[in-house]
Amino acid sequence: TFINHSSYQGRLKESTQLGAELIGIDSVEADAEMIAMVVDGLKKVGLKEFQVNIGHVDFLQSLMEATGLSKEQQEEIYNLIANRNFFGVEELLEQADASPELKETFRLLPEFAGDVDVLKKAVEHAPTDQAKQAVGRLLKIYKLLALYGADDYVTFDLSMSGHYGYYTGIVFRAYTYGTGDAIVTGGR
C-alpha cells in the first residue's frame, strides 16, 4: 500500500497491511477474540514488548452529545483530544452549557488511560448511561482477554474515538518500541 499524506511532505510512504474481519457478530466475545488474535499475531512475529490500547467510541461520543455544542465545536474537541491538548478542551467547554459533572469528566479524560483500574474510575465519573455501558463492555472484554492470556498486553484509553465516525464500538491500537505510530489499528 502506498500512502501520500500531506504530513509526508510529498514523499510516499509504503506499508504492508494485513486485515482481519469478523462479520455479523456484535458480541463482547467477538471483540475479545479479535484483540486476542492481534496479541497472538504480534507474538508470533517475534514481538515481546507491545501494548494493545483499547477504547470505546460510545464513551467519548456520549460525552460530546451531552455538551450541547455544535458539530463543528465537537469536531474541534475531537481534534484537540486526538492531539492530547486537554487544556484546549477545557477552554472550549467553558463556552458550553454543560453540567459541572460533565466538564469534570472531560477534565479527567487523561486519567482514564492505563491498566484495567482506570475503567473502575471511569465508570464512577461516567455521566451518561451510554458511557457506563461502554465501560462495562470494556470490562467484560478484559475478563475474556484474561482467559486468552492476553490481558498483560492490554491497556485502556477512553479518549480514543476512531476516525471520522467509521467505528461504532471498540477501537484499538497496538504500539511497540522504536515506532512513532501504531503498528496495529482496528475496531468495530
Question: Predicted regions: what is each one?
Answer:
Residues G46-V52, E72-E75:
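Short secondary-structure capping/junction motifs at helix and strand boundaries
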Residues H56, R84-N85, D115:
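Short, solvent-exposed helix-helix connector turns and helix-capping sites enriched
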Residues N53-I54, D157:
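Active-site-adjacent beta-strand anchor residues
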Residues K13-L18, I54-S62:
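Short, conserved phosphate-binding/catalytic loop or strand-edge motifs used
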Residues M37-K43, D58-A66:
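Hydrophobic mid-domain F-helix/FG-region of cytochrome P450s
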Residues G68-E91, A98, T176:
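Acidic, His- and aromatic-enriched active-site or binding-groove loops in soluble protein domains
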